[in-house]
Amino acid sequence: MALRKGGLALALLLLSWVALGPRSLEGADPGTPGEAEGPACPAACVCSYDDDADELSVFCSSRNLTRLPDGVPGGTQALWLDGNNLSSVPPAAFQNLSSLGFLNLQGGQLGSLEPQALLGLENLCHLHLERNQLRSLALGTFAHTPALASLGLSNNRLSRLEDGLFEGLGSLWDLNLGWNSLAVLPDAAFRGLGSLRELVLAGNRLAYLQPALFSGLAELRELDLSRNALRAIKANVFVQLPRLQKLYLDRNLIAAVAPGAFLGLKALRWLDLSHNRVAGLLEDTFPGLLGLRVLRLSHNAIASLRPRTFKDLHFLEELQLGHNRIRQLAERSFEGLGQLEVLTLDHNQLQEVKAGAFLGLTNVAVMNLSGNCLRNLPEQVFRGLGKLHSLHLEGSCLGRIRPHTFTGLSGLRRLFLKDNGLVGIEEQSLWGLAELLELDLTSNQLTHLPHRLFQGLGKLEYLLLSRNRLAELPADALGPLQRAFWLDVSHNRLEALPNSLLAPLGRLRYLSLRNNSLRTFTPQPPGLERLWLEGNPWDCGCPLKALRDFALQNPSAVPRFVQAICEGDDCQPPAYTYNNITCASPPEVVGLDLRDLSEAHFAPC
């Protein structure tokens, strides 16, 4: 985020020059015309002239320069000096470049900047000084650049700012001071920046914010204070930022937020307080934030939610409360959040959710309760959440799913119940989930499935039952799942599959039977595109001839191995997933792959 706007400006500038097809004057000697009429180019640089826009750009990037090149044409509009070994800029070094609008000095060895170094650059709009060794900047450094719109000073060693350093930069929109060593800022640090839209102070050592600091920044839209050492947010600190839309306070040491800390932020849309030490929220923590859309409070130490904490956040769309210490959700814990669409409560210490805890959340689409230890959910606990389409309950110690647990979730599309230690799901537990597309029951302790468990789930496409203890599946168990596309019953204890089990699944394309106790299997349905059979004790007699023929005729559906898809250098050497069909009997073919058996072996069939 720290380099977002500066990087964007760089990219847009480059793209415009490439798209317009400028003429290159690479290697032309100073004072010698290039391949067409145009200005001379310094020997160490490449010059690019845009006829249509009548603009000249000079590229001297990464040339190991220890001093500024001689002979830069006076009409240059953009000068790139990044990635060199410049340790200083002499006074008035650019005084003949009055047309310069873009100057890139980032990635060098600049330890200081002379007050007169930028003399003559009255038309400069974009100045990049990131990734140097700057420790301080003298008053008057930017006195000669009144037209600056963006100034990048991130990733230096600045430990202090002079009062009024930026005074006179009334056109500045974007100021990046991130990733320096600033511990204290003077009251008048940003005096004169009345047009500033984005201010980045992330990655410093700020421990305190005084109300006067942001005085005069009435046009500010985005303020990044993340990754500092702030311990508290006091009242009225941001009261003079009426147009602020995004405020980043994440990854500090904030333990307390004073009542009225965010007063005056009428335009705020995004507030990030994640990765702090906040232990509690008061009823008047968020008053006046009527326009807030996103509130991130994850990775704190919040132990409880007081009633009406969020009462003023009528337009909030995303609330993240994951990785806290919340133990209980009382009735109407989220009162006032009628527009909320995403609610995350994962990895808290939730043991109890009261009936009515989610009342009023009529627009919630995604809810994450995973990583808690709920053990038992009240009947109809999700009543009123008709627009919920994804419910995450992974790793929640549920043990058993009872009827009416999911009553009211008529629009649910995805239900994740992985890793819950489930020993049973009662027959009517999933009834009413007519829109369900994906059901994940992976890594539980299910030993059987009720005959009519999936009744009414006619739209289900993905059913994941791997890593349970299923020894058998009723012949009619999957009958309602006529739209099933993906079925995974791997890592169970299945010894046989009824012949009619898969017959209704005409749309099935992916079937995993890996690591069971199957001895025989008739391939069906006919449209399978991927069939996994590894890890079963196959009896390679006559009943398995049909499977052998299917595997040989459809090698892409029953591959011997598949190379893992990796990004970057994650797979060195390449990783493979094998799909052996290893014979466990009869004795004469033990250890062979079914596909390698000859026709003669099956002649008696």
UniProtKB/Swiss-Prot annotation:
Q: Which UniProt keywords apply?
A: Cell adhesion, Disease variant, Disulfide bond, Glycoprotein, Leucine-rich repeat, Repeat, Secreted, Signal
Boundaries of each LRRCT domain copy?
A: 536-605
Glycosylated residues (UniProt): 64, 85, 96, 368, 515, 580
- Which GO biological process categories is it annotated with? cell adhesion; signal transduction
- Disulfide-bonded cysteine pairs: these are 41-47, 45-60, 540-583, 542-605, 566-571
The residues bearing each LRR repeat, given as ranges, are 75-96, 99-120, 123-144, 147-168, 171-192, 195-216, 219-240, 243-264, 267-288, 291-312, 315-336, 339-360, 363-384, 387-408, 411-432, 435-456, 459-480, 483-504, 507-528
Q: What GO MF terms are annotated?
A: insulin-like growth factor binding
| Main localisation | secreted
Please list the residue ranges annotated as the LRRNT domain. Answer: 32-74
Tissue spec: Plasma.
Q: From the Swiss-Prot or TrEMBL record, state where the protein is found.
A: Secreted, Extracellular space
Gene Ontology CC: extracellular exosome; extracellular matrix; extracellular region; extracellular space; insulin-like growth factor ternary complex
User: Among its keywords, does the record have Isomerase?
Assistant: no
Q: Which Pfam families match?
A: LRR_1, LRR_8, LRRNT
Q: Which residues form the signal peptide?
A: 1-27
Classify the source by domain of life: Eukaryota
Pathological association = Acid-labile subunit deficiency: A disorder characterized by severely reduced serum IGF-I and IGFBP-3 concentrations and mild growth retardation. Pubertal delay in boys and insulin insensitivity are common findings.
Q: What does this protein do?
A: Involved in protein-protein interactions that result in protein complexes, receptor-ligand binding or cell adhesion.
Assembly: Forms a ternary complex with IGF1 and IGFBP3.
- Name of protein: Insulin-like growth factor-binding protein complex acid labile subunit
Q: Which organism is it from?
A: Homo sapiens
The taxonomic lineage of its organism, from the top, reads: Eukaryota, Metazoa, Chordata, Craniata, Vertebrata
